[in-house]
């Protein structure tokens, strides 16, 4: 079964996120477990933790269908050791917040070399940071999101993600999230059945469907291979609805959170319905 939702607001407290997801007809959602533009935050209060769990029950969304997103500040591949350590500490804090809330998946952008070190050295830094994070936490799966390759961000090519996974010690706690806008920006096409099958065959060969733990379903304002991150509403960008029809009818993709990050949140309920209607037999 396809589990579809959006990256909903946790404004006023994380406990609001499940209710915000329910309002749009979602059976999955993403959220930030703290302010994504600050390095640190006060600990979660016991009442807020309890409210989150209660509201999750009210929403009827299962914990495994939540894809938390880490802070935009974190750079696990940072060229500077001190800055990389700062990122790692914040990353570990966010993993622990997920653990406390009962969230099983934390999505993150791999990292950036900032044009100060080689791509290979940066990828090694990322893998090393992940290993340290895993060694200092429990249970939560760390989900690598492919990037658009904008600037010096890595993770836009399946080979780069495969290298990171190869160098992670505990592969039971590592996963991948495919962002369709980012993938298209990185040169991966979804628009026809043949193009989709080629892209996903390459993903399976280089990474493996077994690591696919979530998806971000976004159309794009840019053409194929431009390496710019510009989201668009479903069907209004260069990917078009056929791309999403191919995804929604892929039987290899089931029971993972499929998250909208499209630009107009007022139409998320409609976009969720569109995605469900694309499934053949519905």
Swiss-Prot record:
One of its GO terms (biological process) is base-excision repair. It holds the Pfam family AP_endonuc_2. It comes from Campylobacter hominis (strain ATCC BAA-381 / DSM 21671 / CCUG 45161 / LMG 19568 / NCTC 13146 / CH001A). Zn(2+) 3 binds at residues 182, 229, 231. Its cofactor is Zn(2+). It catalyses: Endonucleolytic cleavage to 5'-phosphooligonucleotide end-products. Zn(2+) 2 binds at residues 145, 179, 216, 261. Its EC number is 3.1.21.2. Zn(2+) 1 binds at residues 69, 109, 145. Binds 3 Zn(2+) ions. Belongs to the AP endonuclease 2 family. It is an enzyme of class 3 (hydrolase). InterPro entries: AP_endonuc_2, AP_endonuc_F2_Zn_BS, Xyl_isomerase-like_sf, Xyl_isomerase-like_TIM-brl. It comes from the Bacteria. Keywords: DNA damage, DNA repair, Endonuclease, Hydrolase, Metal-binding, Nuclease, Zinc. GO terms for molecular function: deoxyribonuclease IV (phage-T4-induced) activity; DNA binding; DNA-(apurinic or apyrimidinic site) endonuclease activity; phosphoric diester hydrolase activity; zinc ion binding. Endonuclease IV plays a role in DNA repair. It cleaves phosphodiester bonds at apurinic or apyrimidinic (AP) sites, generating a 3'-hydroxyl group and a 5'-terminal sugar phosphate. This is Probable endonuclease 4. Transmembrane segments: none annotated.
């Amino acid at each position: 079964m396809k589990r579809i939702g959006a990256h909903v607001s946790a404004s006023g407290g994380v406990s609001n996120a499940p209710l915000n997801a329910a309002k749009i007809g979602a059976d999955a959602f993403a959220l930030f477990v703290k302010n994504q533009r600050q390095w640190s935050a006060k600990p979660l209060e016991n009442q807020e933790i309890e409210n989150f769990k209660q509201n999750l029950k009210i929403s009827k969304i299962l914990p495994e269908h939540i894809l938390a997103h880490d802070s935009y500040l974190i750079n696990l591949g940072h060229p500077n050791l001190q800055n990389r350590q700062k990122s790692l500490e914040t990353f570990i804090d966010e993993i622990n917040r997920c653990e406390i809330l009962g969230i099983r998946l934390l999505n993150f952008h791999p990292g950036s070399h900032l044009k100060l070190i080689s791509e290979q050295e940066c990828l090694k830094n990322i893998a090393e940071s992940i290993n340290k994070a895993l060694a200092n936490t429990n249970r939560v799966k760390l989900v690598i999101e492919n990037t658009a390759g904008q600037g010096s961000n890595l993770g836009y090519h399946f080979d780069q993600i495969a290298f990171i996974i190869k160098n992670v010690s505990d592969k039971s706690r590592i996963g991948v999230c495919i962002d369709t806008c980012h993938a298209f920006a990185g040169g991966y096409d979804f628009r026809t059945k043949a193009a989709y099958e080629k892209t996903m065959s390459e993903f399976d060969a280089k990474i493996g469907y077994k690591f696919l733990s979530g998806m971000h379903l976004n159309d794009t304002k840019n053409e194929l291979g431009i390496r710019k991150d510009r989201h668009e509403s479903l069907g209004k960008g260069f990917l078009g609805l056929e791309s999403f029809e191919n995804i929604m009818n892929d039987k290899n993709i089931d029971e993972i959170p499929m998250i909208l990050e499209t630009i107009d949140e007022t139409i998320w309920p409609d976009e969720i319905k569109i995605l469900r209607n694309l499934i053949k037999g519905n």
